[in-house]
Regions:
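A beta-rich soluble binding module of mature secreted/lumenal proteins
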Residues: 1-149
Length: 149
């Protein structure tokens, strides 16, 4: 994974429901920016149930420097020290960096992200095949609405 190419804005197309996003109605976006060697700033945002924009800022660190495809992310810091790291594995990445499947080794979490708010039916079907090949059940992924007001 080329971190400079991976940087930027990603729209959440679908995800496995999880406790830390349960307040999100949609418009979920992740933004990544390299900040130092082996570290990436992460800013996630979504439309909250109360109509406000909810934002979470964290940091990702590379744990597999050979591929840059295995990272850990933390959104909890205490006195500048990040705590509670979670796995963030790039399982499938388009050659042109237009879409990505992110998951965890225990299959508990998963996301389909895209550079655009929507994916074609053909690409989505392909990604469902890639999810199966990675050990995921595509049926547990819930579509994320984009463009909500």
């Amino acid at each position: 994974v080329d971190l400079d190419r991976y940087a930027g804005r990603w729209y959440e197309i679908a995800s496995i429901p999880n406790r830390f996003q349960r307040h999100c109605l949609g418009n979920t976006v992740a933004s990544y920016r390299p900040v130092e060697e082996q570290r990436i700033e992460v800013i996630n945002s979504c439309l909250d149930k109360d109509g406000s924009l909810d934002t979470a800022q964290g940091i990702a660190r590379i744990v597999d420097t050979g591929s840059n495809a295995k990272l850990e992310v933390s959104f909890v810091s205490l006195f500048g020290w990040h705590l509670f790291w979670g796995d963030y594995w790039v399982l499938e990445l388009a050659d042109d960096y237009s879409y990505v499947i992110v998951g965890t080794p225990n299959y508990r979490y998963g996301w389909i992200l895209s550079r655009t708010p929507e994916l074609s039916t053909e690409i989505r079907q392909y990604l469902d095949e890639r999810l199966r090949a990675s050990g995921y059940d595509p049926a547990v992924f819930v579509e994320t609405p984009q463009g909500l007001q």
